[in-house]
Amino acid sequence: MASPLSPGSRILIGLIRGYQLVISPLLGPRCRFHPTCSHYGIEALRRFGMIKGSWLTLKRVLKCHPLNSGGDDPVPPKLDDNREH
């Protein structure tokens, strides 16, 4: 079962959803990556929480510019802290 989202993560996801529903349709498709930066951000926040999810999202958005060719760039998997070495 997935852990519950923090209030901060919920707020950030709400802001991203607002962007997706209001601003993104006006701008048209511009993201060079798959999944899009906004979908990446939501997944990163759900998977890693507010701090690390925000950091991963910021790094992704900063890579999304005309000099980067883009392509497939999924959210990294969350490693299990209880794994055996």
UniProtKB/Swiss-Prot annotation:
On whether Coiled coil is a keyword of this UniProt record, the answer is no
Q: Where is this region: Disordered?
A: 66-85
- Indicate the family of this protein: Belongs to the UPF0161 family.
How is this protein annotated for GO cellular component? Answer: plasma membrane
Taxonomic lineage from the root: Bacteria, Pseudomonadati, Pseudomonadota, Gammaproteobacteria, Enterobacterales
Q: How does it sit in the membrane?
A: Peripheral membrane protein
Q: What is its main location?
A: membrane
Q: List the disulfide bonds.
A: none
**Matches recorded under NCBIfam families:** membrane protein insertion efficiency factor YidD
**UniProtKB keywords:** Cell inner membrane, Cell membrane, Membrane
Query: Which Pfam families does this entry report, sorted A to Z?
Result: YidD
HAMAP family xrefs = UPF0161_YidD (MF_00386)
Function noted in UniProt: Could be involved in insertion of integral membrane proteins into the membrane.
Q: Provide the protein name.
A: Putative membrane protein insertion efficiency factor
Query: Does this UniProt record's set of keywords contain Cell membrane?
Result: yes
List the subcellular locations: Cell inner membrane
